[in-house]
Amino acid sequence: MVVIRLSRAGAKKRPFYHMVVTDSRKRRDGNYIERIGYFNPVARGQEVKLHIDMDKMTHWQKVGAQLSDRVSALLKEHSKKSETAA
């Protein structure tokens, strides 16, 4: 099954996550099919905390990719911010 989930990167005590499309049997930080965004939980000031390429996200969801729990929560948060900004 194809899933959209977070892959950890960054230094110790400074996490940074790539939002990736991957096979569910692969390791968390292993090979992936496509990178579609990123999440920086420790963003400061004007740094972007969450970036998602929505065209790629909708494409993979139409193809049948499942969202992880954390990614679906981040997507909800992202859509709320988009609505309030618009």
Swiss-Prot record:
GO cellular component term, pick one: small ribosomal subunit
Single biological process term from Gene Ontology: translation
Protein origin, superkingdom: Bacteria
Keywords: Ribonucleoprotein, Ribosomal protein
UniProt keyword Signal present: no
One Pfam family hit: Ribosomal_S16
Keyword Ribonucleoprotein (UniProt): yes
SUPFAM superfamilies per UniProt: Ribosomal protein S16 (SSF54565)
Stored InterPro entries: Ribosomal_bS16 (IPR000307), Ribosomal_bS16_CS (IPR020592), Ribosomal_bS16_dom_sf (IPR023803)
GO molecular function list: structural constituent of ribosome
Similarity comment: family membership: Belongs to the bacterial ribosomal protein bS16 family.
The name this protein goes by in its record: Small ribosomal subunit protein bS16
Organism: Legionella pneumophila subsp. pneumophila (strain Philadelphia 1 / ATCC 33152 / DSM 7513)
Gene expressing this chain: rpsP
